[in-house]
Amino acid sequence: MASSVTLLLWSLLLLGTLSAIQAKKSKENLKEITHKVYFDVEIDGKAAGRIVMGLFGKTVPKTVENFRALCTGEKGIGKNGKALHYKGSSFHRIIPSFMLQGGDFTHGNGMGGESIYGEKFADENFKLKHTGPGFLSMANAGQDTNGSQFFITTVTTSWLDGRHVVFGKVVTGMDVVYKVEAEGNQSGTPKSKVVIVDSGELPL
């Protein structure tokens, strides 16, 4: 009887361990990097460095393809008559201990932008969370209003979970992210002009 109970306990323990491993693996798979892209950044006309970002294309393929193509500029001219390209656009909203926002290549002030699918596209899913600094997420004006604007977190921003689609993470260049963050203030208006002077895709 005692040996049967012991065997049952060991079986339950093994099952629990396997379940925990599987859950961890599933969580890691959500963050599997399928593409790498970069921004070369200038602050007030001076080179600040490169931000390299890994994109989670298996979890949010449509959102990732939008961002990737806007980094390369391969889609040409959009409906607004502007190049569908982050190159030359700025970080127009920077709030220390929160995030840096960019991607408005049509207006430059947070009122514009355009996706490769047309002006806006729907929220793909909210499987990924804003669990720390360096996460890449879609800026929006409410539900299903994704365009080209994005933000990079500089802290955990869990209150944005379920409201903004996370699709990538900075893999190198957080020092550059923090340099950009230092140009912000609580109003969000940058102290200096922060420009993405080049952007593109890198091999994995």
Swiss-Prot record:
Residues 1-23 form the signal peptide. Pfam families: Pro_isomerase. GO terms for cellular component: chloroplast; endoplasmic reticulum; extracellular region; plasmodesma; plastid. GO terms for biological process: protein folding; root development. InterPro entries: Cyclophilin-like_dom_sf (IPR029000), Cyclophilin-type_PPIase (IPR024936), Cyclophilin-type_PPIase_CS (IPR020892), Cyclophilin-type_PPIase_dom (IPR002130). It is found in: Endoplasmic reticulum; Secreted. It catalyses: [protein]-peptidylproline (omega=180) = [protein]-peptidylproline (omega=0). PROSITE patterns: CSA_PPIASE_1, CSA_PPIASE_2. It comes from the Eukaryota. GO terms for molecular function: peptidyl-prolyl cis-trans isomerase activity. Keywords: Chaperone, Endoplasmic reticulum, Isomerase, Rotamase, Secreted, Signal. Ubiquitous, mostly in aerial organs. Higher levels in leaf and buds, and lower levels in seedlings. Its main location: endoplasmic reticulum. Binds cyclosporin A (CsA). CsA mediates some of its effects via an inhibitory action on PPIase. Residues 38-201 form the PPIase cyclophilin-type domain. Its EC number is 5.2.1.8. Belongs to the cyclophilin-type PPIase family. PPIases accelerate the folding of proteins. It catalyzes the cis-trans isomerization of proline imidic peptide bonds in oligopeptides. Seems to be involved in root development. Interacts with the PP2A A subunit PP2AA1/RCN1. This is Peptidyl-prolyl cis-trans isomerase CYP20-1. It comes from Arabidopsis thaliana (Mouse-ear cress). The lineage of its organism: Eukaryota, Viridiplantae, Streptophyta, Embryophyta, Tracheophyta.
